[in-house]
């Protein structure tokens, strides 16, 4: 039987049923490289088991929180705190994997250590959660950063990738238009936040119903985190102020002119 050499990107969660399926899918393959886009629990934990089975090295930007603008304790629940790559890669590095070249494209925002992998031979970008096929990424502070996310989206517009293969959703065959729509969506959301501040709505829990009309109340927490990411960016840029540390319970006020 002929075994192919393959690289596995984001092997997934450390779940027994998932690991069994992963092992079955790879039974006729020779895994030479394990590439990790970012350290969330649905992406990186299975890398440890896959490495044990195959002996392949793991590649990633670094441990969870690597690349964050500000230090401090990691508080988000979805981080894989145990991941540490065998090979730490940086923006522009090229991985020769099973005869093909993967260019590492650092795209912080969804997480500070997020990396996309560009398959040069096919002008294809494995975009992880930076660009997903069905919605914009959730940006959860402190490891998620809205300013970094927007800069990383604009960075992709300078590239010539023809197709994106996201971790969630189908292939994206009009990547530049797709990314431009994500940028426009986030700028619209930012404008809504500034409008709320202008109207005297100063607390995130009071902003959510107006900015997300009709949203299931069970999702208010996630929506609030997204607004917090926008507000942290506005505070850093001097377009808003917070009474004390900017967090979900802070009082925010608008200063200066709105960015439109």
What are the roles of these predicted feature ranges?
Residues 1-2, 259:
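Short, small-residue-biased leader/transition segments that mark boundaries at the very start
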């Amino acid at each position: 039987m002929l075994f192919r050499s393959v690289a596995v990107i984001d092997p997934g969660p450390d779940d027994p049923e998932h690991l069994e399926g992963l092992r079955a899918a790879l039974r006729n393959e020779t895994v030479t490289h394990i590439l990790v886009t970012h350290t969330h629990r649905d992406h990186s934990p299975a890398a440890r088991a896959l490495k044990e089975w195959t002996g392949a090295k793991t590649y990633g930007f670094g441990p969870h929180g690597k690349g964050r603008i500000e230090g401090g304790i990691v508080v988000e629940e979805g981080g894989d705190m145990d991941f540490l790559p065998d090979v730490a890669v940086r923006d522009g590095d090229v991985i020769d994997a099973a005869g093909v070249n993967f260019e590492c494209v650092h795209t912080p925002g969804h997480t500070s250590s997020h990396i996309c992998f560009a398959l040069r031979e096919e002008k294809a970008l494995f975009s992880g959660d930076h660009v997903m096929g069905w919605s914009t990424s959730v940006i959860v502070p402190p490891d998620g950063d809205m300013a970094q996310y927007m800069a990383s989206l604009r960075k992709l517009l300078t590239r010539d990738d023809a197709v994106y293969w996201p971790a969630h959703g189908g292939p994206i065959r009009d990547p530049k238009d797709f990314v431009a729509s994500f940028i426009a969506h986030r700028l619209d959301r930012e404008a809504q936040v500034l409008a709320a501040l202008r109207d005297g709505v100063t607390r995130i829990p009071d902003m959510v119903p107006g900015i997300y009309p009709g949203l299931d109340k069970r999702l208010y927490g996630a929506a609030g985190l997204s607004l917090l990411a926008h507000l942290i960016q506005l505070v850093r840029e001097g377009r808003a102020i917070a009474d004390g540390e900017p967090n979900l319970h802070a009082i925010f006020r608008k200063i200066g002119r709105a960015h439109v």
